[in-house]
Amino acid sequence: MKMTSKKMKDELMKRLSRPEWDFQYDSEKEVLRIEQKDSKKGINVSLPGVVAKWEVNKEKAIEEVAYYVQEALIAMHKEENSAAKILPVIRSTSFPKQAEEGNPFIMTDHTAETRIYYALDSNKTYRLIDERLLQKLGLTEQQVREMALFNARSLSYEFKQDTVAGNTFYFLNTNDGYDATRILNESLLQSMREKISGDMVVAVPHQDVLIIADIVNEIGYDIIAQMTMKFFAEGHVPITSLSFVYEDGDFEPIFILAKNRKKTDGKEKG
């Protein structure tokens, strides 16, 4: 059998076929490129050189090249994942629970309106962690949660401040994709609680904003409700139009408090 570059290309593609890898063939230069779908990092193989080796070593030449490419791509993938950070992201409870049928995302309950998902972020690529990716990473769900919360605490924060009718509003909007994630930083919430004199209200209307408010009167509640609705409507990744009263580590949706107030008011009038 006479070996050609085209036959060698077909042989290598057959041996290196994996769902996470792509092939590109330049017939003019007789080069086969094998690359990772996610990162686009890869290896170029000059086919005439492999054919020349095949003329001498036959099957062994193909095995050596396939092994070299496979090991190099796996090493690249490990290097990329070791440089990547796992971070939590806040999503609405209506957000999909599966990447595709039979492949659920790794999730944690947060509030009645929000759920925590986990992202593998290597600066260039961003992917929510599902069960299949979890297996590739060689981590447990608990390890992912612990790593994510640790990394969330390292996110910087600097608030802009505005006061309306005696109520003070603090805005975080760095646009790093993790503004809403800061709601999981317990030490940040506690430090804000210490400087707030009224009710501490927290809102994550969309992915790129965290609002913390010092509410001292009913006008403040009206303002935060309108503000949250406006941000929710404008966000690229909307989360919830509701805001929450934060107390002792718990988040109570405002509409529940409003209902309770109405019941109390009704009893007093009766």
Curated annotation (Swiss-Prot):
It holds the Pfam family DUF1444. It comes from the Bacteria. Belongs to the UPF0354 family. Transmembrane segments: none annotated. This is UPF0354 protein BCAH187_A4826.
